[in-house]
């Protein structure tokens, strides 16, 4: 009887961890919390990402452009893709990502597609739902990143592959 109870509890614990791991809202909350622990978001100057000059986005003193530790931590903890975009004019450009192109390289320098997520974050709103990311279907969440003055300066993203 004790073995059955222990087995049942272990199964429930594993099931709960898988349910949590595939919860896009919990995963985006974790990404945003990790970024927030580094410091307040801001844009300062420019940086080259995939051969293109784009605004440099910082959290605290850490420049996020071409820095992959936070997004790779999300992959490790949640088995999810993660990206930080910076706003460049009317576009949002991937400056830190674990999303891979079909060639197997990080998709930095690519833009957020003009889709439902783009429409929501452009208005300062979260988007969670199905989305195509560089040709792959995901259950995703996107949050606008705002500076101290409330201006949208970027977007955080996570996705769980369907």
Residues of each region from the PLM?
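Bacterial N-terminal signal peptides
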Residues: 9-15
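Sec/Tat signal peptide C-region and signal peptidase I cleavage site
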Residues: 17-21
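Extracytoplasmic/periplasmic sensor domains and loops in membrane signaling proteins
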Residues: 65-79, 96-135
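Hydrophobic beta-strand positions
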Residues: 84-86, 99, 145
């Amino acid at each position: 009887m004790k073995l059955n109870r222990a087995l049942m509890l272990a199964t429930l614990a594993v099931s709960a961890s898988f349910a949590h791991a595939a919860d896009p809202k919990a995963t985006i909350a974790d990404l945003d919390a990790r970024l927030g622990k580094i410091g307040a978001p801001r844009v300062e100057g420019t940086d080259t990402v995939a051969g293109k000059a784009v605004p440099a986005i910082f959290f605290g003193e850490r420049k996020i452009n071409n820095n992959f530790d936070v997004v790779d931590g999300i992959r490790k903890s949640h088995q999810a893709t993660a990206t930080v975009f910076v706003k460049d004019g009317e576009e949002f450009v991937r400056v830190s990502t674990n999303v891979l192109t079909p060639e197997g390289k990080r998709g930095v320098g690519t833009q957020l597609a003009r889709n439902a997520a783009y429409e929501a974050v452009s208005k300062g709103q979260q988007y969670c739902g199905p989305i195509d990311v560089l040709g792959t279907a995901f259950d995703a969440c996107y949050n606008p990143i705002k500076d101290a003055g409330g201006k949208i300066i970027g977007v955080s993203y996570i996705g769980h592959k369907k």
